[in-house]
Amino acid sequence: MDRIQENTPHPDQPLSGKVALVTGGNRGIGKAIALRLGELGAAVAICGRDSSALRKASAELLALGIRVHSQQADVTRAGDVAGLVAQTEAALGPISILVNNAGMGLFGPVHEKSEADWDTLLDTNLKSVFLVSRAVIPGMIEQKSGDIINISSLAGKNAFAGGGLYCASKWALQGLSGCMAEDLRGFGIRVSTVCPGSVATEFSGRGPKDPSKVLSAGDVAHAVAMIACQGPQSFLSEVHLRPVRKA
C-alpha cells in the first residue's frame, strides 16, 4: 500500500514526473500554459525566438520552483527543432506533453497579401506543428504514452472578412490534428486541439477592447491543464473556448 502511495502523484501536482515542451512559451498564452503545467508538477521546456522574453519567462518559472529548460529556437526550421528536442530531453528527460502553441496572426483581404505573407504565416502556424510533433512522437511511441495539444482557434471553424490566411492556417491545423489523433491513438498518444476565441494577449489586435468580453491567457492554460490531467482511458479531442459575455 505504501509503495502505491509513493508512485501516485500528489493530488495537487497530478503532472509530477511529466516533462512538457511548450513552443512559444516565452510570452502570452504559451507562458501562461507553461506556468500552469509547472504548478501542476511538470518540468517545463519553453522556446521562442525572442531571447529577452525567454529569459524573463524562465526566471518566472524558476521563481516558482519549477524545473525549466529554456532555449532560443525557430520552430519553422527542422534543424532548430531537432536541437530543441534533443536538449530538452537531455536537460529534463523524455517529453510526455507537447503543447504546439507558437503562432502568429496576419490579417487583411487575400488579394492584398503577398506570397511571403502566406509562407510566413503557414510556416509559423502549421509547418511548426508538423516539425515539432514529428520530432517528439518517436519518444512518445517508445514510452507508449503522450499528450500532444495543439493551440488552434475558433478561426479554424469560422470564416470572417480579412481572415483568409489566418483561417486557412487554422482550418488546416484542425485537419492535421484530427489525422494525427487517428494515427497515434494506437500507441497510447492522445492528440487534442484547443480552439479559443479572442484572447486578451492576442497578437492581432482585432476584436473588442473590453477585457470582460475576451478570454485571458489563463483561461487557455486552464483548458490545456484539463486535457493534460485527463484520465488514461479517454481524451478530449477538441475544446472550444469562448468568453461568457458576448462582444
Spell out what each predicted region is:
Residues 19, 26-27:
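Conserved glycine-rich cofactor-binding loop
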Residues 153:
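Residue(s) in the substrate-gating loop at a strand-loop-helix junction
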